[in-house]
Amino acid sequence: MTRPTRPFVSVIMPCRNEERHLDRCLESILASDYPADRMELLVVDGMSSDRTRDIVAEYARHHPVIRLLDNPRHIAPCGLNIGIQASRGEVIVRMDAHVIYLPTYLPILVQALLERGADNVGGVLETLPGADTPVARAIAIGLSHRLGVGNSYFRVGAPEPRWVDTVAFGCFRREAFERAGLFDEELVRNQDDEFNFRLIRRGGRVLLMPTARAYYVARTSLRQLWRMYFQYGYFKPLVARKVGRVMTLRQLVPSLFLTTLAACGLAAVWWRPAALAGMGIAAAYAAAVLAASAAASPRHGPRVAGALTLVFPVLHVAYGLGFLLGLRDHVLRSRPRTAELSALPMSR
């Protein structure tokens, strides 16, 4: 693309209490190879209680492309919709405050959007540890390992561009929102998955571009990781209810694993083979976790490998329990916990 033909791009960044990561994120966006006079950056703040707003305001004083908007409802989908409605761009790009973007990230996405017939294009996230501790480093490994996240291509990567069901964040044609509507504000998490499903159902296409790369800064503790993946699992049944089906089979695996173990434990009271089946399943899972963790030891050291034996179960059990409770609340009882989750950070 030559400079005059580059579309005007609106970058939308919903955030809340992101003072730790915001400087690096904003600096990376401002260093983009995409021309500054062909973009705007709308930071939509969910009424942060830390220094997030001050940081954005200071950057806005020196960089007129940045605007600070308010999101009084706190949660990410509301912030996204506020940003979209206030934006001017022909192309709308969602970005996240927990991420550091390479200078080529935005140009690659925009070019692919225009040349490949896609309605939404995303890149690949390389996961960085949020701290220099064995647990934080293990979390980063787990979030980019197939045992941890399955075939989630935007996390584990792909050798070439491919059409997918969802991507992280996304670079959209404005017409995509005219076609499919805005983000669903009932979904504290997984709102991008639901939107992409809606877009595809209306004839849109979602493309993963492996050459568009960014660095996602992961959570630093097992408690933070548990909370995040519990939320992901919790809102998946609500997404399934809205779209009329489970979007991918990998979403069912953690909850099926937990319910199978529980069923074997209960059945073992009356039928001894059930206990053996449950122990066999648990042993196979433990062997997979230990093998994956041991494989990380030569490169990352035994302390990180030891922490990884905890990271994989946290990912799977938190997601599985969240899914089961979400099934109860969103499908069986219709008692969502959106309000009590609204104060949590927005990042992936």
Show where each model-derived region lies.
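Acidic donor-binding/catalytic loop of UDP-sugar-dependent glycosyltransferases
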Residues: 51, 97-112, 197
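Cell-envelope/extracellular polymer assembly enzymes that use nucleotide-activated donors
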Residues: 7-10, 40, 194
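A conserved acidic beta->alpha catalytic loop
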Residues: 45-54, 73, 96-99
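Short aromatic/hydrophobic "clamp" motif used to bind/position activated sugar donors
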Residues: 92
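Conserved donor NDP-sugar-binding/catalytic core segment of glycosyltransferases
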Residues: 103-137, 141, 213, 217
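N-proximal low-complexity "stem/linker" segments adjacent to membrane-targeting elements
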Residues: 1-31
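Catalytic donor/gating beta->alpha subdomain of glycosyltransferases that bind UDP-sugars
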Residues: 129, 178, 184-247
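Glycine-rich, basic loop-to-helix element that forms the pyrophosphate-binding segment
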Residues: 71-87, 107-108, 163, 167
